[in-house]
C-alpha cells in the first residue's frame, strides 16, 4: 500500500509527540510512506493544490495526523482540506479521486485521557465526528482512529511526549 500522511501540526519544530510519530512511521514503513508536512508546504498562506491532489491520487491510504486543538483539528489542516478537497476532485460531478482510499485519523491530545472522561462532556473521538461525514461524502472508508493522550507532557522532560509519540507511531 502507498501510505500518505498529512501532518497538520502548525509547527512541527515545537512538537515532541507529533514529530516522534512521524519519525516512527518513517522507520517502520520506509519508502511505502510519504509525509506531507503542511507547516512547510503552505507558502504565503496558500497550498499548491495540484501537488496536494496528485499526492492524494497516488495514495491508497490517507492518514490525517494532527494535534487536537480546542477539541478540533488545527486551522492549518482545516485550510488544507478546504483548499484541496475541491468540487470535481473530491466530490460532486466527476469528483471521484478519493473514492475507495482508506482514511485514517491519527490525533494527539495534550491532556491525559482522564480529563476527557471525567471533566468534559465528550471524549476526543466525539469531537472529531466531522470526519465520518467527510469520509462518506468523498467515498473513503474510514478506518478505526488512533488517539494518544497526555502528549503535552512535562516541559522539563520532553522525552515523555516523545515516548508517547513513538508508541503511537508503531
Regions found by a protein language model. Give the residues of each.
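N-terminal beta1-alpha1 ligand-phosphate binding loop
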Residues: 1-31, 36
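Short histidine/acidic/glycine/proline-rich micro-motifs that form metal-
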Residues: 10-13, 40-43, 121, 151-153
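Generic recognition of short, well-ordered alpha-helical segments
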Residues: 16-20, 47, 75-79
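Glycine-rich phosphate/pyrophosphate-binding loop and the adjoining helix
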Residues: 22-26, 130-170
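Short beta-strand elements in bilobed, periplasmic/extracellular small-molecule ligand-binding domains
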Residues: 31-39, 141-147
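N-terminal beta-loop-helix "entrance" segment that forms/cooperates
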Residues: 33-55
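Surface-exposed cleft-lining segments at the edges of enzyme active sites
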Residues: 42, 114-121, 156-160
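Helix-loop-strand module that forms the ligand-binding subsite of alpha/beta enzymes
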Residues: 51-132
Amino acid at each position: 500500500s502507498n501510505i500518505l500522511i498529512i501532518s497538520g501540526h502548525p509547527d512541527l519544530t515545537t512538537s515532541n509527540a507529533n514529530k516522534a510519530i512521524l519519525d516512527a512511521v518513517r522507520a517502520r514503513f520506509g519508502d511505502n510512506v510519504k509525509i506531507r508536512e503542511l507547516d512547510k508546504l503552505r507558502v504565503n498562506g496558500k497550498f499548491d493544490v495540484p501537488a496536494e491532489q496528485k499526492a492524494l491520487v497516488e495514495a491508497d491510504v490517507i492518514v490525517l495526523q494532527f494535534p487536537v486543538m480546542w477539541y478540533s483539528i488545527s486551522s492549518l489542516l482545516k485550510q488544507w482540506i478546504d483548499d484541496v478537497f475541491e468540487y470535481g476532485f473530491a466530490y460532486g460531478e466527476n469528483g471521484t479521486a478519493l473514492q475507495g482510499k482508506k482514511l485514517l485519523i491519527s490525533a494527539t491530545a495534550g491532556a491525559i485521557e482522564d480529563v476527557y472522561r471525567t471533566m468534559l462532556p465528550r471524549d476526543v473521538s466525539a469531537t472529531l465526528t466531522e470526519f465520518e461525514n467527510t469520509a462518506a461524502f468523498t467515498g473513503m472508508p474510514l478506518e478505526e482512529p488512533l488517539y494518544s493522550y497526555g502528549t503535552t507532557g512535562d516541559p522539563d522532560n520532553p522525552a515523555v511526549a516523545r515516548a508517547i509519540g513513538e508508541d503511537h507511531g508503531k
